[in-house]
Amino acid sequence: MISKYECIFLDRDGTINLDPGYISSVRDLKFYDYTFKALKLLKPLTKSFIIITNQSGVSRGIIKEEKLIEINSFIHSKFLENALNLLDIYYCTDLPGNSSTFRKPEAGMFLQASSEYNIDLTKCIMIGDSYKDIVPAKNLGMSSLFVLSGNGKKDLHKFDHLFKPDHIAENLFLGAKDLIK
């Protein structure tokens, strides 16, 4: 079977898990009730998933990078438990005003993933709850799904008629249902 998407890129906070601010330990990470049901709906559309996330809490001193790595390991284990192929989690710890080309809305993490896993980004989709998730996707020729969970409702006004996501949904589960149609 040919996959619709070579890879599905996911934002983390506000997209697959609640976004209470800065998540500094595994116990603070709460997946939405529908997250894995949604990802299982998406599984037939792709070979794999990659998470792309800004994590400036490290640079702000709110979380140690070792704790972030523990959180990432926990996320990997949850994907594995649900028979979902999570290739990698890319994160950028840069502060918003002092960022490299890796912090979203820049494309660095996407380009690194593309290079490391030989992924054609134009055959991928990015799913996120922030304008910053959709900007690099559009700039790289990726499809996009904007979810209104997390920061989505707050960021929705930032899109205009010339620059908008390919799909908009209330949350990841409803977006997944739309994508599998």
Per-range role (PLM):
Residues 1-50:
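Active-site neighborhood of HAD-like aspartate-dependent phosphohydrolases
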Residues 20, 25, 57-62, 95-100, ...:
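A short acidic, helix-capping loop that chelates divalent metal ions and anchors anionic groups
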Residues 35, 39-72, 86-98, 137:
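Substrate-recognition element of Asp-dependent hydrolases with the DxDx(T/V) motif
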